[in-house]
Amino acid sequence: MEDSFLQSENVVMDADFMDGLLLDGCWLETTDGSEFLNIAPSTSSVSPFDPTSFMWSPTQDTSALCTSGVVSQMYGQDCVERSSLDEFQWNKRWWIGPGGGGSSVTERLVQAVEHIKDYTTARGSLIQLWVPVNRGGKRVLTTKEQPFSHDPLCQRLANYREISVNYHFSAEQDDSKALAGLPGRVFLGKLPEWTPDVRFFKSEEYPRVHHAQDCDVRGTLAIPVFEQGSKICLGVIEVVMTTEMVKLRPELESICRALQAVDLRSTELPIPPSLKGCDLSYKAALPEIRNLLRCACETHKLPLAQTWVSCQQQNKSGCRHNDENYIHCVSTIDDACYVGDPTVREFHEACSEHHLLKGQGVAGQAFLTNGPCFSSDVSNYKKSEYPLSHHANMYGLHGAVAIRLRCIHTGSADFVLEFFLPKDCDDLEEQRKMLNALSTIMAHVPRSLRTVTDKELEEESEVIEREEIVTPKIENASELHGNSPWNASLEEIQRSNNTSNPQNLGLVFDGGDKPNDGFGLKRGFDYTMDSNVNESSTFSSGGFSMMAEKKRTKADKTITLDVLRQYFAGSLKDAAKNIGVCPTTLKRICRQHGIQRWPSRKIKKVGHSLQKIQRVIDSVQGVSGPLPIGSFYANFPNLVSQSQEPSQQAKTTPPPPPPVQLAKSPVSSYSHSSNSSQCCSSETQLNSGATTDPPSTDVGGALKKTSSEIELQSSSLDETILTLSSLENIPQGTNLLSSQDDDFLRIKVSYGEEKIRLRMRNSRRLRDLLWEIGKRFSIEDMSRYDLKYLDEDNEWVLLTCDEDVEECVDVCRTTPSHTIKLLLQASSHHFPERSSATEYSLWH
């Protein structure tokens, strides 16, 4: 008797436990291979797990939907699809709905709309439901006779609701001719879509765009709705606002909470344990990447630079994830981005919220190739091609370039670095120059990163083909990956810019001639096909820095001192062009040979001093004519050329060649590089009688001779100045430089958008100049900044020492305004592993 009492008590306790367990609903799943729908007959009349006994069993739920008035049409096909597609899963798993009075999906959708109205943070919004129905033998989405809600005080939303009722969109995957519209894309893709302003849509993307403009509606969010545990899309909830919707997360979270309240859901799913990565070693490269992006933005005034990586790699969840696309989804690394322009910070936040699929935008395209991807205007993309195109349009961003790099720590973690060009850089020629400058930044690629080789790209393509992965389709897009590099000329870019596919703008990184060659990075994004191979650096699987160093070493060995001497007469820039290297490389080679300054650069400094003396002499009345001091400077190249020619003749085989007639080069054509080295080429002409010196005459001798003559002339001029200064009766009203002008410098400094003017004593010390400027701009540590001056050729030249300041003053004294124009920028010298080989291009 006691046993039966205890037994009945245990039954009551078990029933209470089960009631509590099933109160909110749960899943049952078999583990021994059996199936719920194939349960063996039981001796009892009713099975304890009879599917018909559950309030929200799949069969019962869908049958109720299919017989519910107008809404019955929207699930007629889904009932069949669910029984066929999910049959195996439903046999293994079963959903037990929560206790209490059951409600159909239709009722819950109505409740969801009411909940969204209460949960949403937006005021002045229209909430409407789009559901699939059968119409004319086709499945279409409609909002007619479906639940909706809007602000009763806003007539614009009421008008837009009446307009939306008259629209329907295709709900069939194979119906390519019909317009899907925003609700159709969300329903078919099972992914949410949002825009800060629907007015940015094209009419083929959003057929209601003209009505939206008339009704003055802005931000729009559309999300798919699912049942718990099901992948069948029940419909689409669209939220239309009268204000711009910049941030997605607040509204999305509100809608998701409203759906969960009625046991529905949207697309945001927890990361499946099987897809969670455990290798976070890629984070070791993030500090170097951050520094790389910072240097690029501060050097070239870029508004934004971002780092993209796969969501799977960083275990990141998002609203655009589902089981099918998770491995193709990419997102930004929030702590590896740099915002150079505070006005685009919200755009960066939107990028962080809105993940991309590989193939979307320049960043998504870069994941599918091993070269850079460039677009002259990302705001021209369709929404399906680049979901953030409307945000780019809103914040005035146009040009963008991205390149894919691989982490050597893991061998599989890929980063895509995305750079947005300045907002005012919208001209194609300006963009080309900016890309040319940005390409030099890639010479600073950290040693922990490398590019993807062609072989690795081929292997990835084979895997994609085997798995039959479908990436977002981009109409008329060029092939994004393959063995052939994607190159385009400037004319092709201009033609492509007139189309709606800015992704056709060419890639300029090209592979090697052989399959095993490294991956070439050309000096600058050169759109011409005749790039000089000597001006290229090489990426390889071992990292850019190592290969670039090997290539530099090989090039340096082939340029001897004798080769350099042949070009001493001209400018350093001309010499670099003739030799086939960049000016910075030539300067490094000169330093290896003990040449600290290009010879004509030295003589030019002396020329500036002589010109200053000449001005002083000319300003004194009573002096009969100027002294001919300019002839020494002008004749310097002739002296070198005269010594150079016999040396060349001695090396040639008989008979000796006829005298060479050199063409005239522009007079005093100056060129300044980033480290303040300057070159000049003066007017030269070599006649037939200029080769009379013996062949043994050395170029160094000519240099010494010229230098001695100049020193002698300078010495005599100094004596003349001393004599003139000792005169007691100098006529009044002379143009002699006043002591005030001699003691003070007029300086104009630009720092970003700020400009200051100042006068300071002529100490000609760089330290004093930096201190004075730092005091005006309230900068404590001036070592983190670079200071440049504008020379007579309108080029910015870096000030690095007191000698540079002296030359800067001498040069600026020759200008009519006698004002020194300076530019203050964030220094790139704090950049790790910066090589002198890229200094010139960085400031070019």
Swiss-Prot record:
PROSITE patterns: PB1, RWP_RK. Residues 540-626 form the RWP-RK domain. SMART domains: PB1. Pfam families: GAF_NLP (PF22922), PB1 (PF00564), RWP-RK (PF02042). Residues 641-709 are annotated as: Disordered. Residues 661-682 have a biased composition (Low complexity). Its main location: nucleus. Residues 683-695 have a biased composition (Polar residues). One of its GO terms (molecular function) is DNA binding. It comes from the Eukaryota. Keywords: DNA-binding, Nucleus, Transcription, Transcription regulation. InterPro entries: NLP, NLP1-9_GAF, PB1-like, PB1_dom, PB1_NLP, RWP-RK_dom. GO terms for cellular component: nucleus. Residues 744-827 form the PB1 domain. This is Protein NLP4. The lineage of its organism: Eukaryota, Viridiplantae, Streptophyta, Embryophyta, Tracheophyta. The gene is NLP4.
